[in-house]
Amino acid sequence: MARFRTVPVCAAALMAFACSSAFAADPAACRSVRFADVGWTDIAATTGLASTILAGLGYAPTTTLASVPITFAGLKSKQIDVFLGYWSPTMDPIIEPFVKAGTIKVLNTPNLTGAKYTLAVPDYVYQGGLHSFQDIAKYADKLQGRIYGIEPGNDGNALIQKMIGANQFDLGKFKLVESSEAGMLVQVNRAIREKQWIVFLGWEPHPMNVQMKIDYLTGGDAVFGPNYGEARVLTAVPPDYSARCPNVAKFVSNLQFTTSIENHLMVPIMNKEDPQKAAAAWLKGNPQMLDKWLAGVTTFDGKPGAPAVRAYLGAQ
């Protein structure tokens, strides 16, 4: 797809130079870039990075907090432009009807690989004998018959509820406790302080992996997928977004993160720092990432992107 328009003929005196001024700007309607955030710190981090860079390019990014189902409905209705948090395979059953109907497009390249998403326990619970999904029911009393999830409508919660409903691993009498990422982590931290037993939905990247001593349970391949629910995180957009807003689409297709980047960037966000402020500070310390993420990307008005973002960050 075309990312820029070149002038058919450059003046002879300028032929030795790149015709950078020939880049075409996105249409005016593309200046507003509407992201969705489903309330997870990793998505707040990546959305904060993308929004900070887009602001430096002269765009006007905004973020809407919404559940996963509402986010996908927003992409379908074109009220949301970009969602950086499609975790595959756990979200596959939720998004597949939209993709098959042609109302959502998933970009080809994941923005994160090597993620994990499955049930976890504090280290002392693991050392006490709870190593796998098959062990959970044996410790029902210590666990008070509860598995802690995050927000209602979340894909991980749905997998846990399906497991309970089917009485997999003899968990039919267990209860899924839904709240939010923050609410679940409050419960986990309280349990750790009091050395109580708890099993909860864990994932990486997330600061929980460096701030708490936790272990992931084995044996959950049939529920969360192999290798501790190994996941890819992908970017979803409306089906015609790349044609309507090619410059922004090129930018978000360039975005590739690592678990290390996200683990570290999430720490200040967990400490209540604004995601875009945290992103700006991280980008100042890691400016080399801009060259990769802004390859082939211009400012909103068609100028070279990377110099503009560096200047923007320098003024922060």
Would you name each region that the model predicts?
Residues 80-85, 152-221:
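Ligand-binding pocket segment of bilobal, Venus flytrap-like solute-binding proteins
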Residues 116-126, 230-244, 267-268:
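A bilobed periplasmic-binding-protein/Venus flytrap-type ligand-binding module shared by bacterial periplasmic
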Residues 47, 64-102, 183-187, 207-212:
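Pocket-flanking alpha-helical
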Residues 23-34, 138-144, 293, 312-316:
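Immediate post-signal peptide segment of exported/extracytoplasmic ligand-binding proteins
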Residues 50-58, 140-174, 284:
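Ligand-binding cleft/hinge of the Venus flytrap
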Residues 27-42, 59-64, 144-148, 252:
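Short, well-ordered beta-strand elements
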Residues 103-152:
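A conserved helix-loop-strand patch within extracytoplasmic ligand-binding domains
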Residues 31, 41-42, 162-193, 199, ...:
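An extracytoplasmic/periplasmic, membrane-proximal ligand-sensing/linker region
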